[in-house]
Amino acid sequence: MLGRSRLTFVLLAAAVTCAEAQHAPPWTEDCRKSTYPPSGPTYRGPVPWYTINLDLPPYKRWHELMVDKGPMLKIIVNSFKNMVNTFVPSGKVMQMVDQKLPDLLGQFSGPYEEEMKGIADVTEIPLGEIISFNIFYELFTMCTSIITEDKKGHLLHVRNMDFGIFLGWNINNNTWVITEELKPLTVNLDFQRNSKTVFKATSFAGYVGMLTGFKPGQFSLTLNERFSMNGGYLGLLEWILGKKDASWIGFITRSVLENATSYEEAKNILAKTKLLAPAYFILGGNQSGEGCVITRERKDSLDIYELDPKQGRWYVVQTNYDRWKNPLFLDDRRTPAQTCLKRTTQENLSFATLYDILSTKPVLNKLTVFTALMDVTKNHYEAYLRDCPDPCVGW
């Protein structure tokens, strides 16, 4: 009990610190400039590229990647296990994950179950732990996504991927444990069929869903978590109890990237498909006005907020809060992003200026794993690993 009390105290102290830091230098700063091309202390390095051959049987598609990344996946899976065992020292939870979870969850749709089995066999990690690693992203993703349209009608779609809140804090170097362990697992993926690109994405090795990607010439898509009382935990419980009529959000995102052929088709699927967890889908197209944030409950859409440059709406910004509500006072990334966009102006939109915005604290924070930049029309896709050196807010 003492260990849990100390953990609670640390989390409360972190929350108070972040609440104070959200609106005070040096944890916030004026809009950054000249950070692109990426360099300096906020740049960890490039994200490596791998090809996923969709012509291969699902079981074999990830083998080459996982031979490279398997050792790093074992590190993060062991960190998850250690955190669980801290709360349940008997080890029974992880025993259930290893022995019971695959049967509890039953079959997954499409190729995903066979892909996870292949990953488990190559890495020699129990299938239950690979499944739990994939489930994890349904519950703990915090991000900032932006779509912009310039005066010529050209669209850009960018995002910071923030992940790992409350999942272990390293007091020696002031970093989130899981966030840091995800960086070596971050990969750019070129999904190909008949040796031609179907879509590109940035993801984590071992995860078969998608959170960030684009279909060249057609549309771009990012997924942000949406917190709700009717949330992912309830959807997961329903799935375990046998109600399997909803889609995993990472899987539906991948399915849309792989199979949808237009912005409108993608928007229709994302707006209407029943989901296991609430979410924000940030979708960009290839022509003027094609950009929106789809705010989803599990069963239906609450709101579709679209670009409307004729009415002065030349950007959309989505973090992890409904646009009609104020962000949580200790986690306001929306206001700094909007402020920097307005200062940038519609005339000066580019990968460089948008990377500057995503490099400005607290949009950039201790949870930020990578920054992705997407230009659908020009088939230009970039992703970079990030750091946020002290002083930097925890989220």
Swiss-Prot record:
Q: Does the keyword Glycoprotein apply?
A: yes
User: EC number(s) of the enzyme?
Assistant: 3.5.1.23
Q: Glycosylated where?
A: N173, N259, N286, N348
Q: Where is this site: Important for catalytic activity?
A: D162, N320, R333
Quick one: a GO cellular component term? membrane
| Pathway(s) annotated for this protein in UniProt | Lipid metabolism; sphingolipid metabolism
Cysteines engaged in disulfide bonds, as pairs: C31-C340, C388-C392
The UniProt catalytic activity note for this protein reads: an N-acylsphing-4-enine + H2O = sphing-4-enine + a fatty acid; N-dodecanoylsphing-4-enine + H2O = dodecanoate + sphing-4-enine; N-tetradecanoylsphing-4-enine + H2O = tetradecanoate + sphing-4-enine; N-hexadecanoylsphing-4-enine + H2O = sphing-4-enine + hexadecanoate
| Sample GO molecular function, one term | N-acylsphingosine amidohydrolase activity
Q: Which UniProt keywords apply?
A: Disulfide bond, Glycoprotein, Hydrolase, Lipid metabolism, Lysosome, Secreted, Signal, Sphingolipid metabolism, Zymogen
Signal peptide: which range, if any?
A: 1-21
Q: How does it assemble?
A: Heterodimer; disulfide-linked. The heterodimer is composed of the disulfide-linked alpha and beta chains produced by autocatalytic cleavage of the precursor.
Return the similarity comment: Belongs to the acid ceramidase family.
The role this protein plays is: Lysosomal ceramidase that hydrolyzes sphingolipid ceramides into sphingosine and free fatty acids at acidic pH. Ceramides, sphingosine, and its phosphorylated form sphingosine-1-phosphate are bioactive lipids that mediate cellular signaling pathways regulating several biological processes including cell proliferation, apoptosis and differentiation. Has a higher catalytic efficiency towards C12-ceramides versus other ceramides. Also catalyzes the reverse reaction allowing the synthesis of ceramides from fatty acids and sphingosine.
What is the protein name for this chain?
Answer: Acid ceramidase
User: What lineage does the source organism belong to?
Assistant: Eukaryota, Metazoa, Chordata, Craniata, Vertebrata
